[in-house]
Amino acid sequence: MEGAKPTLQLVYQAVQALYHDPDPSGKERASFWLGELQRSVHAWEISDQLLQIRQDVESCYFAAQTMKMKIQTSFYELPTDSHASLRDSLLTHIQNLKDLSPVIVTQLALAIADLALQMPSWKGCVQTLVEKYSNDVTSLPFLLEILTVLPEEVHSRSLRIGANRRTEIIEDLAFYSSTVVSLLMTCVEKAGTDEKMLMKVFRCLGSWFNLGVLDSNFMANNKLLALLFEVLQQDKTSSNLHEAASDCVCSALYAIENVETNLPLAMQLFQGVLTLETAYHMAVAREDLDKVLNYCRIFTELCETFLEKIVCTPGQGLGDLRTLELLLICAGHPQYEVVEISFNFWYRLGEHLYKTNDEVIHGIFKAYIQRLLHALARHCQLEPDHEGVPEETDDFGEFRMRVSDLVKDLIFLIGSMECFAQLYSTLKEGNPPWEVTEAVLFIMAAIAKSVDPENNPTLVEVLEGVVRLPETVHTAVRYTSIELVGEMSEVVDRNPQFLDPVLGYLMKGLCEKPLASAAAKAIHNICSVCRDHMAQHFNGLLEIARSLDSFLLSPEAAVGLLKGTALVLARLPLDKITECLSELCSVQVMALKKLLSQEPSNGISSDPTVFLDRLAVIFRHTNPIVENGQTHPCQKVIQEIWPVLSETLNKHRADNRIVERCCRCLRFAVRCVGKGSAALLQPLVTQMVNVYHVHQHSCFLYLGSILVDEYGMEEGCRQGLLDMLQALCIPTFQLLEQQNGLQNHPDTVDDLFRLATRFIQRSPVTLLRSQVVIPILQWAIASTTLDHRDANCSVMRFLRDLIHTGVANDHEEDFELRKELIGQVMNQLGQQLVSQLLHTCCFCLPPYTLPDVAEVLWEIMQVDRPTFCRWLENSLKGLPKETTVGAVTVTHKQLTDFHKQVTSAEECKQVCWALRDFTRLFR
């Protein structure tokens, strides 16, 4: 919103429309207009005026939120001499509005906290606030709100205050932490039975624990700690207060993760949590699920904190295994949501025990894990009145999947075979109800693959028993037994006499709609593992493939079946493969031809993606072993299918989704036959370029990268592929030149640099000598700022591989030429690249991208270290040394230390470490 400042009346009207306009389009217009206002420089004055006038809750909330947002994102707009008056104004507003609405108080508290963090001239802000407001009981609630959000905002991603300022703030808050704790004690004394005040005290204390600035020796003997456990032990504590106290205890436990340096507090918390077992049982008896979940969170956090002690000194001191007993008590609760809270701890325990690899230690924990698995098997039971198959996508289905993953991770402590046999014996010896049988089969399916299939009579017996299950058993039992058979495909491979009965059992499932997809998945597994044995059944698989749509399968299951069929097809004799592949593809090709001949307006779906996906999976997994000189058996089939794919692509050229599936299908066709697809190269490239000039689908760039990968080393193809690249670059660059082109088209950036990288890998000299290399590199430099994981990764990989070409394979005859060409490119753009990479790291990209950036800088250094040293020095000179408010972002010593660390690095990871530390100064 540029230009004149809008009137307050206009702002009020927009706020009213946002909240009360019955027309959604009116709300949308108001929201857009107010968003523009918030981004403008007028927002400061307008929001201040709205807060002074206090006309209604809505306008005050908008103004408070705007103030917070402006301070977080646009603080640089204000002159330094206005900061003190802004602070005083905000403190006046929060005092005047303290009774209007809690959400307004929170927004203003955040604004004050964010201001304090960015205002180095406001020294000792905690002391100032406490002195100003602690003696007025009516001001205590908003004072506590400010003191709660202040530590939370220190690590806020919205504020780029830098590591130096952050360190200064944390030291300042640590210095005043005892003042805050004393204030909280005073609040407790004044609160009496005021529950809301107690909740605010606990929230504030938890916030300071989370920042890690409270003195643990001081806190170990503090009355606040005793009060927390007193509240949690009392049966009459309300749900809200209980949650606040639980959150605070969890924060305290998290804060003492380094147990040895916080021993007195660790001991107090440890003893305190152990006293909560009785209170947990009382909550269970009262069926108070909220409190039960809170206790389980506390018990889990206790175990997480003392994990090292539990593993290293089980049963001794802070390794006391009563902690695990508490979690197993929770695992016994009938609601599965309770045990689910502890899953992360059990994963971590399994991980630690796996690394210790100590049989004696493992033996201590075995009984605990067995009890956990029995509890989990019980939690996995469906309701006795459940009808049909188990749901996999609802909350309970997702819980069962997480159980399956956890069991796989912990089974080594019990032993797969021992556990499998125990589970099977419960089915064999008893006559459990169907829901128990199904849950046991589900756990057996989770561990079946980890049981050694060699000469294992129990596995054989289980397989025999399952395939003989009568059709009268509950559908869910049949469903899970089919999944178990699929997981036991290794056993079938070792015992081929079971192949026929197993396939017969699965075929019955395939013919019933509820079981069809599970059966298809199991057949796919059998095909994958028993490829050689399944060759004799190929005709049966072909019959299934021909009538695929009659089986009522999910699209994924149908594709899985075709994948299995293709894997078996690849094991047939070479002379049979061409004919069989043609048969396998013919159903899909006929369907595509039928769609092509249809008039688009007759109401029937003309979407070819199902058939394209099926062809893609067939090409992807038909990978026979072909000796040099032999014609690829799939070549003829793919050449025959090409006209249909080409016509489909042409018909749907404007539809990105369908074109993407066409390209994917062609990609696997090319990969399938490799150099055998040479006859398609010319027509395919011509069609790609023609369509791309009109419709910039990025998948054409990706398909181009596949062609370069397959043919880039063929002398006769290089010029044609370069022509393709140059032709594709023209519309690509035009697309990226549009406003916000990079941000709006990350897929195009990703695929463009995949294509360019393939060129560097397969035919570097061709690209380096071309006219297009400098524009591509310039776009790569511009794209380094793009905060998109895949696109940024592709850009960095291109830059790394491009520069590496100047030093790689120095024994090859084109080495000197490559070295010279890279030298020319770097002379032209090296300084710009280094400056951009440094700026990008400090201001644009998240920390996870730093290893990729470090690799690029490392490669530049390998080409010419002295020149790189100069470039880096120039780049560092261009960085801001102070914030707009005068806080030191980076000192001269920090700059010189970083320069030295990078330029003297002997490994790439040292560059990465230096970057990590340095960029924190700007975050």
From Swiss-Prot:
Role, per record: Importin, which transports target proteins into the nucleus. Specifically mediates the nuclear import of splicing factor serine/arginine (SR) proteins, such as RBM4, SFRS1 and SFRS2, by recognizing phosphorylated SR domains. Also mediates the nuclear import of serine/arginine (SR) protein CPSF6, independently of CPSF6 phosphorylation. The nuclear import process is regulated by the small GTPase Ran that partitions between cytoplasm and nucleus in the predominantly GDP- and GTP-bound form, respectively.
GO cellular component: annulate lamellae; cytoplasm; cytosol; nuclear envelope; nucleoplasm
Effect recorded for R754A: Abolished interaction with SRSF1
Tissue specificity as recorded in UniProt: Expressed in skeletal muscle.
Pfam family, one: TPR_TNPO3_IPO13_4th
UniProt lineage: Eukaryota, Metazoa, Chordata, Craniata, Vertebrata
Modified residues (Phosphothreonine): T896
SUPFAM superfamilies attached to this UniProt entry: ARM repeat (SSF48371)
Residue(s) carrying N-acetylmethionine: M1
GO molecular function: identical protein binding; nuclear import signal receptor activity; small GTPase binding
GO terms classed as biological process: protein import into nucleus
Localization per Swiss-Prot or TrEMBL: Nucleus envelope; Cytoplasm
Classification via Gene3D superfamilies: Leucine-rich Repeat Variant
Keyword Coiled coil: no
Effect of D750A: Abolished interaction with SRSF1. In 9Ala; abolished interaction with SRSF1 and CPSF6 without affecting interaction with GTP-bound Ran
Keywords: Acetylation, Cytoplasm, Disease variant, Limb-girdle muscular dystrophy, Nucleus, Phosphoprotein, Protein transport, Transport
Residues where Phosphoserine is found: S74
Chief localization: nucleus
Name the record gives this protein: Transportin-3
Keyword Secreted: no
The protein's assembly and partners: Interacts with (GTP-bound) Ran. Interacts with (phosphorylated) SFRS1 and SFRS2; leading to their nuclear import. Interacts with NUP62. Interacts with RBM4. Interacts with CPSF6, promoting its nuclear import. (Microbial infection) Interacts with the HIV-1 pre-integration complex (PIC), which is composed of viral genome, matrix protein, Vpr and integrase. Interacts with HIV-1 integrase protein; the interaction is direct.
Organism: Homo sapiens (Human)
Entry's disease: Muscular dystrophy, limb-girdle, autosomal dominant 2: An autosomal dominant myopathy characterized by proximal muscle weakness primarily affecting the lower limbs, but also affecting the upper limbs in most patients. Affected individuals also have distal muscle weakness of the hands and lower leg muscles. The disease has generally a benign clinical course but some individuals with childhood or juvenile onset manifest severe widespread myopathy, leading to wheelchair dependency and respiratory insufficiency.
InterPro entries: ARM-like, ARM-type_fold, Exportin-1/Importin-b-like, Importin_beta-like_NTR
